[in-house]
Each structure stands twice: as structure tokens, then as C-alpha cells.
């Protein structure tokens, strides 16, 4: 509701930290949001400093499977997860013949994988820069329902991430900035030292 009234703020909820995050621009906007929430909902807000947003990926291919078979349900999904180019996000494709699994089931599996925000096995940060290929799947003529593939595909992704962690190929991605710095000659040495100390690089 407030986000609709003040479109420049962005409100989001983190499943990992169980916190509501708001992108604000300065103290004045912070005070305005506090005031609105207090007047409308009688809630006193407390804003804490933001934390670093990490993401996770993998450094080597991993084959994984997810199985879901409670009473009168059945689905099995096999995936190949591969590292993708930085900044590419998550790509989901099928390498499976329609002779093995009908196309509508394949689309369902890919949609189920895409709809979930998958978290890595290191810090529980959002997964990114991964290519996920559907390489095999099984259904039961009588017992398979749509939600069964959702459970099996989510389990397959999770299992793949756990295998990557166990193999030492899970990767934590830290945010970084590219910027141009203009300084007097006498300050260049100090700036270069500071950048190196913070694991930065320069040209």
C-alpha cells in the first residue's frame, strides 16, 4: 500500500533473514515512512543498517536427482546444473526427449524450477548464474499429479547444491562496484593501497 503511494521505495521480504527490507533515500524518507506506519497501523518501526547482499553459484557441473513418492504420488527429476556466465541469472532448459516424458510435463518442471527463489548451501543466499538442464524424469500413469514434479524438482536443485558444497565447488559471490576515482597526484598512492586492502583492483 505504502509502496504504491511512494513508488521510489522498494519493499521486499527476505525468506532467509525473515526481515522486511526497504530501499530508502535518506533520513527524511525514513522519518516519513515511520510516521505513516505509526499513524495508520500504530506500529513503531525500527530501521537497522542494511547488510551485504551475497549470492551463491557453483564452480563445476553437478548431476542431481529429486524423488517424491508419498502414498499415491510419484515423481522423479534428474538435473544437470552447470556454472553460467556472471550476471546471467538462472537459465532452465530441457535436454529430454518427448519419448521419455511428454512435453507438458517438461514445461511444468521447468516452470516449477523457475518459480522458486533457490538458496545456496553455504549461507542460504540466493542462487544465481547457473544453467539447469532437465536430463531425465519419470512419472506414474495413475499417481503423478502436477505438484509432485514441483516437489521432486525443488529437491533435485537442493540436492545438487548440497553436492556442490560437499565437493567444495559451491561459490559465494560478493557484490562489487566499478567506479572512476579522480584524485590529486599526492593522494593516488594512498588510494591504491586502500583499494588493494579491500581486495579491489585498479587500472
Q: Which residue ranges define each predicted feature?
A:
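Accessory interaction regions appended to the cores of large information-processing enzymes
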Residues: 1-203
